[in-house]
From Swiss-Prot:
Originating organism: Prochlorococcus marinus (strain MIT 9215)
NCBIfam families assigned to the protein according to its UniProt record, in alphabetical order: sfsA (TIGR00230)
Family designation: Belongs to the SfsA family.
Gene assigned in the entry: sfsA
Protein name: Sugar fermentation stimulation protein homolog
GO molecular function: DNA binding
InterPro entries for the chain: SfsA, SfsA_C, SfsA_N
Length: 246
């Protein structure tokens, strides 16, 4: 199997000067030029924001963009002091998971998929939007539709990937809504672990105890968690398999 999930133009390399105002990061390129890049990840990015760390950015030539550069990856050291590249663009997670679904890499858990739709309204008030709504193939024994919520996961402690890394009211609401879909539908929470050094996944109780409680309640009700791990490179991302819960 070709484990390259996505390929793209080689990213531009530099070092992080600072991240500020949540959405912005100043980066010094190899040429010596300093540019400001958009940071799509507005969270605290625990364990990642080391000034002077190697980073990678993409460039857009769209005239509609205020900032042509987007911060995509940062290099950190794992527990063995080896370099690990981490994908920090939260908007990229859904692209990865859509590719994973389309390649049938989750079929042993969710079955064969007939159709994939994105951003479909759901919930009691229909004011929320699910990341992916899937219909099963007619050959599937389980005929239930599948709702998938995706969470970008970058925080690691002791080789355990953790989400969230801060209190997330939105994430709590998503767990409640996923639980309410059971048993009529299949509820799936995909943890998109955008680094290769995770061996397990667990909810980030230290950052958000309520989220951890809701996660376990939803799990007991039948929600399916799928921690998907990836390896990030300068011009592609590789599939690194599904990690167990801790």
């Amino acid at each position: 199997m070709n484990d390259r999930i996505i390929e793209f133009d080689p990213l531009i390399e530099g070092v992080l000067i600072k991240r500020y105002k949540r959405f912005l990061a100043d980066i010094k390129l190899e040429s010596g030029d300093v540019v400001t890049a958009h940071c799509a990840n507005t969270g605290p990015m625990k364990g990642l924001l080391t000034e002077g760390a190697k980073v990678r950015i993409s460039v857009s030539h769209s005239p509609k963009r205020k900032l042509p550069f987007t911060w995509e990856q940062i290099c950190v050291l794992d527990s063995k002091n080896d370099e690990v590249w981490v994908g920090i663009n939260t908007l990229f997670a859904n692209k990865l998971i859509k590719k994973v679904i389309a390649k049938n890499l989750l079929r042993e858990i969710i079955g064969e998929v007939e159709t994939i739709q994105s951003e479909i309204p759901y919930g009691k008030d229909k004011k929320s939007r699910i990341d992916f709504f899937l219909t099963p193939k007619s050959s599937n024994p389980d005929k239930r539709n599948i709702y998938i919520e995706v969470k970008n996961t970058t925080w690691i402690k002791d080789n355990i990937a953790l989400f969230p890394d801060t209190v997330t009211k939105r994430g709590q609401k998503h767990l409640i809504e996923l639980k309410e879909l059971i048993p009529e539908s299949k509820s799936v929470l995909v943890l998109c672990i955008t680094r290769k050094d995770a061996c397990f996944f667990a909810p980030g109780d230290e950052a958000d105890p309520l989220y951890g409680n809701l996660f376990r309640e939803s799990l007991s009700a039948g929600m399916i968690p799928i921690p998907c791990s990836f390896e990030f490179y300068k011009d592609h991302v590789r599939w690194n398999g599904i990690k167990p819960l801790k």
